[in-house]
């Protein structure tokens, strides 16, 4: 058993789980740290699929009561509208993802690209937060998930499509998009969590289909370590972010993105 490989799996599992649902780009962090750990080969790419699945299941577990409630009340308008909103928001990312997935993975998965996206995204967060601080942004209309309209969901889904670029952050794009298009901060954050389920599951199964031959039994221990650490770290991150957004804005994440992006650019240039 390669202890160093398991240590890399542990580190990357924590990074995936801790960053997947924060507006700082988990993919960007995995690319940067993967480069530093020399773990961006085919084995590393397959490993990312496993830890992303761990993070997805953390959302399912945290919101299991809501998911079970929706599944058992499909005949109600509330549940049907919730599913419709997720489907509508999922479509733009699915379309752009299928069209551009291969090109982006081949040409844009680099630390330099991530650094630039981190910096631009950081300033975007500051812009949105400043608009809200000066009451120039649209007033929040949806104070809970049941009040989101399909039109709002579609616009959030379009914002999410920006996250096909590594370093942008899927959660950041959906949360900020939600805030811009009429959701309050907490509702936008929770909708981002739920939207992660179909989006990330679709991406994960697509990657499994494309890379199935790279999964080997000898890597089972590495996969297990990464999966478990990603699951646990994601649970902590989800609970922490929900508490955080009750009384804080996202400017701290913006400054973190900008500083990290500058450091990465300086390191590689």
From Swiss-Prot:
The chain crosses the membrane at residues 43-63, 82-102, 108-128, 188-208, 222-242, 249-269. GO terms for molecular function: undecaprenyl-diphosphatase activity. Keywords: Antibiotic resistance, Cell inner membrane, Cell membrane, Cell shape, Cell wall biogenesis/degradation, Hydrolase, Membrane, Peptidoglycan synthesis, Transmembrane, Transmembrane helix. It catalyses: di-trans,octa-cis-undecaprenyl diphosphate + H2O = di-trans,octa-cis-undecaprenyl phosphate + phosphate + H(+). The keyword Cytoplasm does not apply. It is found in: Cell inner membrane. Its EC number is 3.6.1.27. It holds the Pfam family BacA. One of its GO terms (cellular component) is plasma membrane. Bacitracin is thought to be involved in the inhibition of peptidoglycan synthesis by sequestering undecaprenyl diphosphate, thereby reducing the pool of lipid carrier available. Catalyzes the dephosphorylation of undecaprenyl diphosphate (UPP). Confers resistance to bacitracin. PANTHER family: UNDECAPRENYL-DIPHOSPHATASE. This is Undecaprenyl-diphosphatase. It comes from Methylobacillus flagellatus (strain ATCC 51484 / DSM 6875 / VKM B-1610 / KT).
């Amino acid at each position: 058993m390669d202890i160093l490989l398991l240590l890399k799996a542990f580190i990357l599992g924590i990074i995936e789980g801790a960053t997947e649902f924060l507006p700082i780009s988990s993919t960007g962090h995995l690319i940067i740290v993967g480069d530093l750990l020399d773990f961006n080969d085919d084995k590393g790419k397959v490993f990312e699929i496993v830890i992303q699945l761990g993070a997805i299941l953390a959302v399912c577990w945290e919101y299991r009561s809501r998911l079970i409630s929706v599944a058992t009340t499909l005949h109600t308008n509330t549940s049907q509208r919730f599913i419709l909103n997720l489907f509508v928001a999922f479509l733009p990312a699915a379309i752009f993802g299928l069209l551009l997935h291969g090109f982006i993975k081949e040409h844009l998965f680099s630390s330099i690209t991530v650094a630039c996206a981190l910096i631009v995204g950081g300033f975007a967060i500051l812009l949105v937060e400043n608009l809200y601080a000066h009451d120039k942004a649209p007033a929040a209309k949806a104070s809970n998930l049941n009040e989101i309209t399909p039109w709002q969901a579609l616009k959030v889904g379009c914002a999410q499509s920006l996250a096909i670029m590594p370093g942008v952050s899927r959660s950041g794009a959906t949360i900020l998009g939600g805030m811009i298009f009429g959701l309050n901060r907490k509702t936008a954050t929770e909708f981002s969590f739920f939207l992660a389920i179909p989006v990330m599951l679709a991406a994960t199964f697509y990657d499994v289909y494309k890379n199935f031959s790279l999964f080997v039994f000898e890597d089972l221990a590495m996969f297990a370590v990464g999966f478990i650490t990603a699951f646990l770290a994601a649970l902590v991150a989800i609970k922490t972010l929900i508490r955080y957004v009750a009384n804080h804005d996202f400017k701290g994440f913006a400054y973190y993105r900008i500083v990290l992006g500058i450091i990465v650019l300086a390191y590689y240039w």
